[in-house]
Amino acid sequence: MGELRIEAEASVEVWTIDGEARRNALTRALVAELAQNVARVSKDRAVRAVVLTGAGDKAFCAGADLKERATMTPDEVRAFLDQLRTTFRSLERSDCVFIAYVNGAAFGGGTELALSCDLRVIAPTAEMGLTEVKLGIIPGGGGTQRLPRLIGKGAAKDLILSGRRVRAEEALRLGLAERQGTLADAKAWALEICENAPIAVSAAKHAIDEGLHLDLDGALALEQRRYAETIGTEDRLEGLKAFAEKRKPVYRGK
């Protein structure tokens, strides 16, 4: 049996980490399967959005599988972390939109996985946290870099240096999650995004992500280049035509 359970609905896939007994922890096999599927949807224009969640209602992803980690040599740990970082970065760079549905506990690498997604919906009973300092290490899957970019340096230091966990209400207040709701809400959000022109959605996603690393002048030039990518598309013409005809546009990603 695979580590991911994948279901498709229209142009959206739902990926469920299928390891409820181990609180959907990040194993080597799971990370490898995530990497394979990120590569697949990044090439498949039919899939425009992915909702990523965990099996059951107790955990989204409780972080690294510490039982597996205990059997690994230092070199194997380093190799695992390299694969983890590469996979999260590939997910982040994909043209596909990723929405994490944080259905339960998301600690350590589980929160880092959610941070790699474009958007996050959190269940009312879920908790998130980068708890690594309590184990004598630091976040190794991008948490020290993605968290401050999302919620600000001070708030990120608070969470990372204390290792404390936050419930849904605080996660929303901090901006760690954008919405609170159910899996159905996350899927509906994904479907809503998929109604828009896919080339435009991808260009906007990359303009935002890449622009954060530039000064304002450089970021505005980046926006101009990304905008230019949409000018010659059939989708842009379809959007104008549909507006004039007062109907819903049918975008084909061309």
Residue ranges and their predicted role:
Residues 54-89, 106, 215:
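Glycine- (often His-adjacent) and acidic-residue-rich active-site loop
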Residues 1-4, 241-254:
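Terminal low-complexity tails and localization/encapsulation signals of metabolic enzymes
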Residues 1-53, 75, 89:
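Conserved CoA-thioester-binding segment of acyl-CoA-metabolizing enzymes
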Residues 63-66, 84, 144, 153-156, ...:
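A general structural signal for well-ordered alpha-helical segments in protein cores
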Residues 87, 91-95, 101, 107-161, ...:
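CoA-thioester-processing core
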Residues 20, 121-126, 168, 176-234, ...:
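C-terminal long alpha-helix characteristic of the crotonase
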Residues 15, 19, 33-34, 52, ...:
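Terminal peptide-recognition signature
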Residues 164-170:
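Acidic, divalent-metal-coordinating active-site segment for phosphoryl/phosphodiester hydrolysis
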